[in-house]
A protein has these predicted regions:
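Short pre-active-site segment immediately N-terminal to redox-active cysteine/selenocysteine motifs
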Residues: 72-75, 83, 151
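Bacterial N-terminal signal peptides
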Residues: 17-30
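Extracytoplasmic/secreted proteins, especially bacterial periplasmic and envelope-associated proteins
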Residues: 60, 64-67, 96, 104, ...
């Protein structure tokens, strides 16, 4: 499909060769990523203690990420304290999220959210974007990650804003 699209662009647009090459070089990786991200779980590569590239090449949204952290879908506040004062309950099982952007890189945070077990085999944090090897999953949830690739990137975008001290204790 990408080859046909490229041939169409070349034949139907009088763009100078070097410029067209640059355009295709910029667009082609996105098309490849889109093809790889058709399933429920995005492919990823763990390198240097993290997932260096955003899942599916997506850019997260801070507001949606904050809503996921505060809401029941992400349920992060069950274990972590975060600067979300409108929520009465903040857990203390996991480390506080205040200042997490100073302690962890985007790549480390991404792996922590996708599959924390790869960083710490004894963690109680669930894998939010893995489906293989899980037990005790409700039949209607088998094969479906807790968060989509886009939602993971939204959470990461929000966590990267948390570089300050706690708003409350």
């Amino acid at each position: 499909m990408l080859k046909l699209w490229a041939e169409y662009v070349i034949l139907s647009n009088p763009v100078p060769g070097p410029l067209l090459g640059l355009i295709l070089a910029i667009l082609a990786p996105g098309a490849v990523l889109a093809q790889q991200c058709k399933g429920p779980v995005a492919p990823f590569l763990v390198q240097d203690g993290g997932i260096q590239a955003p899942l599916c090449g997506l850019i997260g949204d801070v507001g949606r990420g904050r809503a996921l952290v505060a809401g029941r879908q992400g349920n992060c506040l069950a274990c972590h304290a975060a600067p979300i004062p409108e929520q009465a309950f903040h857990g203390d099982i996991g480390p506080p999220l205040h200042g997490v952007a100073r302690r962890r890189s985007a790549a480390e945070l991404r792996l922590q959210v996708v599959d924390a077990g790869q960083l710490n085999a004894r963690t109680v944090m669930p894998p939010f974007h893995r489906v293989a090897g899980l037990t005790g999953v409700r039949p209607d949830r088998i094969g479906h990650p807790l968060l989509t690739a886009a939602e993971v990137e939204d959470v990461i975008a929000y966590l990267l804003t948390l570089d300050g001290k706690p708003a409350r204790q």
